[in-house]
Amino acid sequence: MPKMFLVLMILLLTNNICNAAIYKNIENDFLIDIGDNWNLSDKSTQEGGMVLIFTASDDKKSTVRVGVSPVIDEKENATLRNMPKELLNEYFDAFIGMTKQASSKYNITFADCKNIGPHYVLLVNASLPMEIYKKDKQLPFVKSNAFIVFKKKIYLFMMDSWDTEETHLQQLTTIIKSL
């Protein structure tokens, strides 16, 4: 039985199993992919954004570390694609350090897992206060983000914290249909 089919069957069982399966995939692959970054706050699509995902949980539960480079250009994109794993660790340690300095409450966890059509969406919460984000637009996190797993590729959606979950899902559904 194909490996991908087995993974999808596991994801269908429960939210907890879904979270665990996605986490295991991230942990094993370390770097899944570099995907496009959609900024939904101004309803525009920005191509060339980078999304890299890797683990950072001390308790080995469903906690992940997420880095989104504020610098979007082809040179850095190519650099990250070819960067050795050890240097990539250092890159994101430094990058995420900026967020830790801004907020001691820094944490990202899987909040929910939803099935929209054939694709899976992970809704995650970032605890960085919105007032800090408003002061410095270069900070990598807003208060509510979502990931979609599409053909083994991770997409990050940055959303306004004042939007409702229903609005988020509507936005995601629209984008998913365009993939």
Whereabouts are the PLM-identified features?
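Surface-exposed amphipathic alpha-helical segments
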Residues: 38, 151-179
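N-terminal "mature-domain start" segment
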Residues: 21-51
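A mature extracytoplasmic/lumenal domain signature
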Residues: 36-38, 44-45, 70, 125-128, ...
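Sec/Tat signal peptide C-region and signal peptidase I cleavage site
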Residues: 16-20
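Conserved polar/disulfide-associated segments of primarily extracytoplasmic proteins
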Residues: 46-143, 147-149
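Sec-dependent N-terminal signal peptides
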Residues: 4-14
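Soluble non-cytosolic domains of exported or imported proteins
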Residues: 29, 82-89, 166-170
